[in-house]
């Protein structure tokens, strides 16, 4: 059966031929407006259906036999490419219909113009269509507008969509054959169409029993495409499509011309594109691959040619991409943008599309019923919500994407763009005159043809510029210009683009010299483009001056390394010491050289010495002398090779932190060895020095700055002080003020007496910080804060001006630093003046009491505060030969808890309680979370809401004092219930973390040492301190022996004179001395002993007199002035008896001392210190209670005042929780730290290998099976003095003078505060400001420990026995004890430290006794060796504060290190709570007061029955947010 639907087309063509003949004849309406059939329309307007049928030339991905898949220019006909693709996609679609399909065979025969595509799998049904009355294969391949894809309710993931595909191929072929077999219908169908589907051949039907298959064979009508044959380009495109199908269709083998294509999946297919492609560094591109789910597969790599994509939708190659590509790319871009912004802080702003331009993405997707913008299906337009699936890329993929080179590529592009901006804005060209830099004194020849002979002198500040200008009077202004620097310039190696662009100093130097970014100054001609041929650096001869030189060298080396090879840089040195005698004068340019001269000059004391601390010390006359001898003072920097580059990079590159550590470690060790061997220090500037290599400068001069930076920033293990703090202490000891002194005046005194060379403002802040005592500052303030020294409201920033506040030494300070030890210390000398010692030697390690924090070069230090009494007790244990007990961080007057998560990992918890279903009360904030900051950054956003989060609370009220915290917060019931579920501590940000993995301190020999645990610090200190007690005893024995001998001689002399055995009247002096020697009298014993010690007792004797003749040499021979100078009234009976008594007492004192060991001396000092500590604490408490309710006064008003300030007794305390996740995170941090240290090869400090850290951790875990918890509270009679945290940021260690809460608080359920949780002492100096926005710089002066004492409670008379000494939990012998007990026990003191009578106390019979072992982190704070045992107080304030449910009475301990502790039980806790709530509801509302916030303490002053919980309490957990400061 033959049809001829093309007849009208042929007639139309004939009509067109006659057109010329009928040109003049008017066209009829019928010939103008014509109707065509669908088939006619397709042939007449093929571009509507298959794209252009004209040859086009464009860049395409093709497959060439010799190179594989490549991107090249091809000439092809899009229409022909499309009809081939339609058949190929149909074959691939069959995989979605029949998952068992496994093979596609493609045959392309250009010679015979024949293309065949065969696939197995379910075939086309060989059955007659009952409606159309023809077989289905004939229907769908030979009839237009037929398809199986018209049911849009059916979700399909196939390429076919509109019903045109295969028919279009038929129409544009001269011959088109369909062959399909159906196992289901047991038939094989075959039919051929000819002449552009114009004629249909006979249909063949045969019986069939094999597997289904379909084969389409066609011969394209090349004439329609204006082609003669299938050329190389179109075949290359078709072959690539065969590879596409092999890569995008899973589990299908594709054969091309009988050969199987070597593609094993999408990942393998992607590699074909990336073969031989390299990144910017010459390495193969990294590919990130993920099979997200069965419908999505993504690969990503870096692109150097803008955004590139290869994508498939249901096997269709979407060469123009579409929304499926955007959907995936946008996810990746959003993540990469965040990373780039973090790494490019301050650089050129990077936008999303710029990040996308560096990506090459491969996407293979199956999408339900996709839509396209044309029949060519190059761009997929379906919206993402209709994809039928999602593609959520995993964190693993994103992490790999960040590391695959894209981020580096973007950052390189950013640098390139930044460079363009720098060149545009910051580079300079050569001009004769420079405008806009007023402080520049330009050389007259700068910018002229003689510019290479000009030198620019860069000076340290305006005063140095004045010196240089004075000197220019000698050398002239033609060749020398001067420009003053304002302090230290930027480290450009680590600076951001924005910093460099905005740095006026850098830009001025570039402009003055005429430098251009990225220009190479290798040859001499390039130097002629500069306005100056050299830069001369003129700074002070101190370490800060060396740093400025180093920064300038770094600036030139980083941007123009070639300039260093031309000797472009030089320095101008000035003397640091001058000595003169008569008219002779010598200058020294380094202190070691001066010391050498002194040691080789016997009469050096006769020379006048003048020290030059800066350029400003030199006079104009001296400046002219310097410039007149330019050869001596000008030192050129000489480039000696790659070692110079390496040295500069070592000093200033951020990436070489570990190398710098090793560099400084070697320096400190070398310096130590030189001291031990008595060798002089190495120095650079000798009399003959004319040049210097950069390597020498870095390793011999700049390293002194880096070391001094550490010395200024990191305290000593011995006294816990930094040099500035030590100078303050030295001055206070020397002044020994009995009256208070203004801080500003004391600062001036310190600068004078201790030779302090920096600004007095920083000195005043150091003094203030040493005196601060608020919660979170010092546990023991060494100075007294007399005036406003700052509070916890603002973290100390609210201190008054130093002109208005006073201070003086704390009465405890000289007990900590006994004067008897001063003689054993090594004092330093500055400008020939004796100043502070290299360290003091306190009786307890102050670095643990007040903590430490600082950031130096290569190292940083972070140590929390610890409890004073715990430290004292541990020292006593060491003195007794016992092992010290573990300690948790502790902050004076802090009422919250600190818990240990892992070794050196802690979490700090504030206090929150629930008052009723809509009200909570916050009564403590984590350490260093200041009240005002918390209000502004946490509560205000919760009250007002933000753009992203709705309001959480409805109102809050504040009842703080300067020492206490109290927020009463209102919420809806629903919000409060939800907050309880999440955890109130977490919601209200009342947990912060503390990491102590950087306990780095200077040891006693001046070397940095890293400590793994706090007990390592304690043991190091103990060994050294014990040795110095031995030295003290030795010194005292000598001194007492000399004094005893002196008194003995004096008494004997007086007695013999009275008896007439010695006659001194009217005798020559020489004869008298002879008589005394004959009678066996000693020459002055005290003077002789002091001379033997080679130490001069008084500072004044160390100071040289300006008068050269004052060096009087002591008379040779014995001296008896101590006898002969005695007054006559010594001969009286009274004075004689007194002298004999003194002699006997001194002998007794000497004998007593001989019988004491160094340990005895130490224990005595500790006993005296603890006794005075209790006096001071009692006074602090008394001072704080001034104005609070007492015995007199109006009780009601006072109670009302208390109710506002103190925590409500009704509150149900929320127990902070530590989740397993928090512990796991802490362990992960430790593992990560150890791993990073091992990988980076950080040098071990002082022989402590990193492996030992792990061993210590394991050892500690065995030793402390349970997690340790410490509830910080202070007992009323003898508070456990919480180790006051030293302001780690400041130069001073502030001491918390107030050790206890100043007010008594009625008990409430919350008050098992002390025992409520097994709080582990955890605090993270890294993340003290999880939410607070205080910036790190200000924190330098403001880090202080928080108040560690809970509110005191008023207790009825019957409970007023003196409380037990602060009890801390004993070491647990049960590793699982933490998990077993729902109610944490309060820490108790070790059995050994308890007074005998307290150990016999038994628990109340009405209370359930639940024995629990807890890790002993705290030790008895009051009953200590060497102090008098005190009676056990009954229910003191502290007792109630710590245990509102009843005094916790310790069960007698079985072992020293394991103490069983009674667990509180509370059968009625819930009912009690209900009663309390009802009381609140019933209480009368005061005038003008919102009842919601009213808690009347009048009704609740009597404590409720004290009991623990019977039920397991609700636990409120907060995860720690960990931000590392360092």
From Swiss-Prot:
Instruction: Supply the alphabetized keyword list.
Output: Acetylation, ATP-binding, Biological rhythms, Cytoplasm, DNA-binding, Isomerase, Isopeptide bond, Magnesium, Metal-binding, Nucleotide-binding, Nucleus, Phosphoprotein, Topoisomerase, Ubl conjugation
Site (Important for DNA bending) found at 855
Q: Which residues form the active site?
A: 804 (o-(5'-phospho-dna)-tyrosine intermediate)
Presence of the UniProt keyword Transmembrane in the record: no
Q: Which residues carry this modification: Phosphoserine?
A: 4, 1105, 1208, 1290, 1292, 1294, 1297, 1327, 1332, 1369, 1372, 1382, 1386, 1464, 1466, 1469, 1471, 1520
Recorded hits in InterPro entries, A to Z, give: DNA_Topoisomerase_II (IPR050634), DTHCT (IPR012542), HATPase_C_sf (IPR036890), Ribosomal_Su5_D2-typ_SF (IPR020568), Ribsml_uS5_D2-typ_fold_subgr (IPR014721), Topo_IIA (IPR001241), Topo_IIA-like_dom_sf (IPR013760), Topo_IIA_A/C_ab (IPR013758)
Instruction: Enumerate the spans annotated as Toprim domain.
Output: 454-571
User: Could you describe the subunit structure of this protein?
Assistant: Homodimer. Interacts with COPS5. Interacts with RECQL5; this stimulates DNA decatenation. Interacts with SETMAR; stimulates the topoisomerase activity. Interacts with DHX9; this interaction occurs in a E2 enzyme UBE2I- and RNA-dependent manner, negatively regulates DHX9-mediated double-stranded DNA and RNA duplex helicase activity and stimulates TOP2A-mediated supercoiled DNA relaxation activity. Interacts with HNRNPU (via C-terminus); this interaction protects the topoisomerase TOP2A from degradation and positively regulates the relaxation of supercoiled DNA in a RNA-dependent manner.
Cited function: Key decatenating enzyme that alters DNA topology by binding to two double-stranded DNA molecules, generating a double-stranded break in one of the strands, passing the intact strand through the broken strand, and religating the broken strand. May play a role in regulating the period length of BMAL1 transcriptional oscillation.
Q: Could you identify this protein by its name?
A: DNA topoisomerase 2-alpha
